[in-house]
Amino acid sequence: ILFFIDGVTVNESLIPQDATHGLFGLLRLLGVELNKNLVLSKAAELVSFGASDPSQTALPTVLPYSYWIKTNEFAKQSSLSNVSVLVFPWSSSVDVSKASGVLVKSEPQSWVETKDFNLSPQTQLEPSNVKEQAHPLVASGTYGKGKFVVIPSSRFIQDGFLSRTNDNIELVMNVLSEHTS
């Protein structure tokens, strides 16, 4: 099973909402705690914000957006061997039991928010009184004879949210190839 799942849902107007998918309990049974938070990082992807309507005269603005985190903190797994950098739009962190493992972490200059999210790209603030550290982002494991991977970002491979590289898709293709053979 390959999960693309949010701990916190972000709608098209950049308004965060509680995730309503009802899969938190199932993930716990698999040994993965999907946290109800959002990970931010100083290692942020450049994102274009602004007018998407051609009739508007405002030009889009491209800026680093802390809620779209870039990382190359990977476990030594074959599914990551040809991947150089991954981008996670509005990702939550995961905690794993001993039976599960962490495939990908955020960069060490990262932190989490659990409430009072301000997703506006114009008001990205540096963390204050927050410990920066790497946070687990992708978990994998087995359950019985089955295998699973949890990617805590439902937009991880959606067209409008892909990074400038194909590495997000490359990871997914590698995972599918490994888990179906």
Model-predicted regions and their roles:
Residues 1-180:
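Acidic, S/T/G-rich, low-cysteine, solvent-exposed domains in lumenal/extracellular/periplasmic regions
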